[in-house]
Amino acid sequence: MSVALLTAAAVAVVGLWRHLMRRLESAHEADWGGVWLNRLDGLNRIWCRRFHRLRAEAIGLPQSGPALVVANHVSGLDPLLMIAASRRPLRFLIAQEEYERPVLHRLFAAIGCIPVRRDCNPRAAMEAARRALECGEIVALFPQGRIRVGSEPPLPLKRGVAYLARASGAPVIPLRVEGIRGEGRTIGAVFLRSRARLRHFPPLHLREGDTDRFLHRLQQTLTGQ
């Protein structure tokens, strides 16, 4: 192969790489505080909108200040869809065993995920989430606690969402994930093409002494039952 041909190929690769980086940078909408994290944000939005045909308006977040974003949990694709519909970074509470997955651990740490130990008292995670809300951040969680497919009976909501809403005074913004082909799967759901939809609902506010009613209403909203 001639030097000229090798040079032309190298120039073409560099050109394609630069074009891709510009495309990712133009697609990102949330500022994660770093060039590469913002590029990943752009990649995720393209993936969810093109491959998973995501239908969703931007989540109705306040321009500044805290909020809790909560959703039903049907697959490992759910958090990617929520990020793709958010104009602000989301800090997810995730299970400790998921947080410690090889390779992904560095990414989870970089985007501020908060690990929750499910085998013991989750107080440390709740306090970390409360501090994030006090700093004006957006915290996202799945109050059912684990993945639940539509054919299973509803799971009772974890009371941590009520604690965070009460302690921070932040609005709770419910979402319902629908149209996922890979229900019940984690990594596999990301690569099974879906017609994903995020349904938005009005914010909820927890009033003093109203925890049970709040959780019941949130359960109905997330499950549609």
Please tell me what each predicted stretch does.
Residues 26-27, 63-120:
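Catalytic core of membrane glycerolipid acyltransferases/transacylases, capturing the structured
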Residues 7-8, 16-17, 124-225:
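Non-catalytic C-terminal accessory region of glycerolipid acyltransferases
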Residues 56, 101, 123-126:
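Structural motif corresponding to alpha-helix initiation and N-cap regions
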